[in-house]
Amino acid sequence: MGFGWQGSVSIAFTALAFVVMAADWVGPDVTFTVLLAFLTAFDGQIVTVAKAAAGYGNTGLLTVIFLYWVAEGITQTGGLELIMNFVLGRSRSVHWALARSMFPVMCLSAFLNNTPCVTFMIPILISWGRRCGVPIKKLLIPLSYASVLGGTCTSIGTSTNLVIVGLQDARYTKAKQLDQAKFQIFDIAPYGVPYALWGFVFILLTQAFLLPGNSSRYAKDLLIAVRVLPSSSVAKKKLKDSGLLQQSGFSVSGIYRDGKYLSKPDPNWVLEPNDILYAAGEFDVVEFVGEEFGLGLVNADAETSAERPFTTGEESVFTPTGGAPYQKLVQATIAPTSDLIGRTVREVSWQGRFGLIPVAIQRGNGREDGRLNDVVLAAGDVLILDTTPFYDEEREDSKNNFAGKVRAVKDGAAKEFVVGVKVKKSSEVVNKTVSAAGLRGIPGLFVLSVDRADGSSVEASDYLYKIQPDDTIWIATDIGAVGFLAKFPGLELVQQEQVDKTGTSILYRHLVQAAVSHKGPIVGKTVRDVRFRTLYNAAVVAVHREGARVPLKVQDIVLQGGDVLLISCHTNWADEHRHDKSFVLLQPVPDSSPPKRSRMVIGVLLATGMVLTQIVGGLKSREYIHLWPAAVLTSALMLLTGCMNADQARKAIYWDVYLTIAAAFGVSAALEGTGVAASFANGIISIGKNLHSDGAALIAIYIATAMLSELLTNNAAGAIMYPIAAIAGDALKISPKETSVAIMLGASAGFINPFSYQCNLMVYAAGNYSVREFAIIGAPFQIWLMIVAGFILCYMKEWHQVWIVSWICTAGIVLLPALYFLLPTKVQLRIDAFFDRVAQTLNPKLIIERRNSIRRQASRTGSDGTGSSDSPRALGVPKVITA
């Protein structure tokens, strides 16, 4: 290679930085900043300080930063949430749910930066998915992908696009090639739109096979017991009419009644109160279905109690809602040397030995489904267990019997507030059940009861009650779900009148958690007696008390030391009362500012006006105003009109993104100045010349950028690759616009690694995905889009034909399933069952599990000569009947 020691140093330390970032040891913002400082330390022989610092003032980067302000202003008004809730409507299948959710997001993210777009869409899709009965995991990865795909349709759709636009402008303006410097807002659309459409098509066609169900990151395909509550909506109904058989990710493998276990029950079986159903599925799904249909979770202890007729005392093993309570669920795997192997679950003294109670066990492992207590334990079995006060992870017995680390799965004892919300007359929840309104199944949120306007009450167990105007819904919620509840359209806090009387402008209002001091002056008094609003100019919205659910009426609660108050107050309130003797801890609740709906129209119009300045300028090939000052002026108007406050604007900026992009600019300047970029560009030039095709060179640029995007962030990948691609493009006489398009598409193609893109990371956490689940859909998606990009880049001159074919194919694939719903229900169920079998047949994990199960069963048969995999101790209790 034709570069000296400067190039060698640049390559070596840049490669080291890639390793550090790929291993996630240090974030890209810090890594690139340190790398850039190091490269400037050679007296300007690698890169001068001036060139290294130039990236911090790049107009493309400044545009990215100030567009965060615009997005924050729109989000704070709640306008986009109302629009998206209207657009989403209702859906009857995963196919239509994806079509309804992905396409609007793609359109929206073409003009609004995809990161804030995903931020406000996550809670909307979670609630909407629950209302439609669609597994949340089927929606959140496509949400991230849709926001990325939509962002490739315009030059302002993603921060990466803006970065590349800025780099192109700076490069060719400096070279006095002004005709090549400008990249208009829709210059990428002829290529980005087909790219997005074919990505959309891939998700629709493969969702049944590649997208995960509504599961956690931990054990899947569990055997879980649930009890039909007396008030359940499925009681006295046939199994086929109950709605349980239509639930995705949930199947009934058996039913226990009157001392008998019925395996594979007939769909005509009539369910009775206190029946125990044995569900095969994933914990989150089963828990949601249980809440939806009135089924209580049954652990091993409760299952034992249910073997005898219920008496008054024995019913206490269930909570008032009918389920066995759990504190903190953990997952454990039976070790190969465990003395539990060969014993049934009922024969183990779980609480005495481990301080644990079995809740569920992973199916398979060479045995048929049965009752939880009758399962014969084997090496490798994965159990979900509840913890008791006597649980100690470091106990020697636990270490000897469980392989590896016992992992926490779910906390059932999280801090809980009881919040009352009143239903407005115009609310969309009116005349809907609690489930249909989207208020069931939301993580951290549980409906307790409904107080009707006439003074009567409806318990949460009444699953058929339809909400009416002026009803008060009492909800138990953890702090994470409070923000969702505060922004739910058509609901307002019961304490809203008290909140309004504080006089605090909605612009500066948020929530704070305040822990009551044990020796404070408000202990032993009610909120009303304290005259809390008058004394503190704040309103108590809810109260949490450890180990107890406090009464619903906030004003009449007698405060105790250790109570945690949820307070609506001014943003400065926590600082002003930091040393107040009434409280020992004050903690603001993130993202708890109420939506400024009265400013919704203003916010949307201002953002639309900003986008129109770029659209009109692009159509007339004239820049009336650069997007950077346009974004700043739009944000200023949003501040003046009360769409957001200054603190919210400051916090909206992702400074790690700024530092990453700016430093990456400097590193790319170092690679270009030392000749490293030119050396790598020669490889791309050789590909183009050897294949006599500009398209081949552009494909090489796309693939190299996409691979780099999986290792780094999308912005860093674009900044590093741009000088390399630009040199190659100039040598091959490729238009700078076409070169930039290849980099823009490639830099956004971070689909396999959830940590490679900010949008991926947000849905990864919200959906509780595993890295493997991302890779299963992301790897084939990446390959598919490489093929699509190859065609698009090779036929850039024929983009009109590519557009027509893409739109026609997309329309056909989206609309063709509409014919499915014209078929009779029985035929639909048969088709669904067929595709479920196909999906299971093609699932590599299930194929391996089936083979291992057959091998284990054959091994056991050979060793005991019985030809059966069941232990004698598991037989006879209870009697098993096959329908």
From Swiss-Prot:
TM region positions: 3-23, 30-50, 60-80, 106-126, 139-159, 185-205, 600-620, 624-644, 657-677, 693-713, 774-794, 802-822
Protein topology in the membrane: Multi-pass membrane protein
Biological process, per Gene Ontology: potassium ion transport
InterPro entries given in the database record: Cit_transptr-like_dom, DASS-Related_Transporters, RCK_C, RCK_C_sf
Parts forming coiled coils: none
Domain RCK C-terminal per the UniProt entry, residue ranges: 211-295, 317-401, 406-491, 497-583
Protein name as it appears in the record: Sodium/sulfate cotransporter 2
Gene (UniProt): SLT2
